[in-house]
Amino acid sequence: MSIHGTAVIHPSAFVEEGATIGEESYIGPFAVIGPEVVLGARVTVKSHAVITGWTELGDDCMVWPFATVGEVPQDLKYHGEHTRLIVGARCRIRGGATLNTGTEGGGGVTRVGDDVLIMTGAHVGHDAQIGNRVILVNNVAIAGHCVLGDDVIVGGLSGVHQWVR
């Protein structure tokens, strides 16, 4: 486990052996950080958020309560392969949002660019590629393998079918 000396971890948080926590990061009460997770500098993980899987969050990201970041893909073809979720810098992942890792058949990586806002209850499916400065409004569902370019705004309660670019 690599926890920078300036990181603050609440006593009730559960940070698994092997996790990497960057400088000046904060892990809140009852948050869970998995063993393969890498958090950049100044990342804030609020109460009850879960970050797991082979997941990387860039510098200055914030994750709100009850978000689930880096869980395995919702794909019946997934059988435990080493796949990843990479989130860029300065992203905001609001409460109840879900972001899945990739699948072997889809390239193995779900990617979220820099300066992205993922609002409450939104979902980013396996192997999705989300550009920079994207906003996913409340309860948006981005299915597997979707590609969103830079500066996209998806309105609330919208669904984007898998493989859409």
Predicted regions and their residues:
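Structural signal for interior beta-strand "rungs" in well-ordered beta-sheet cores
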Residues: 2-165
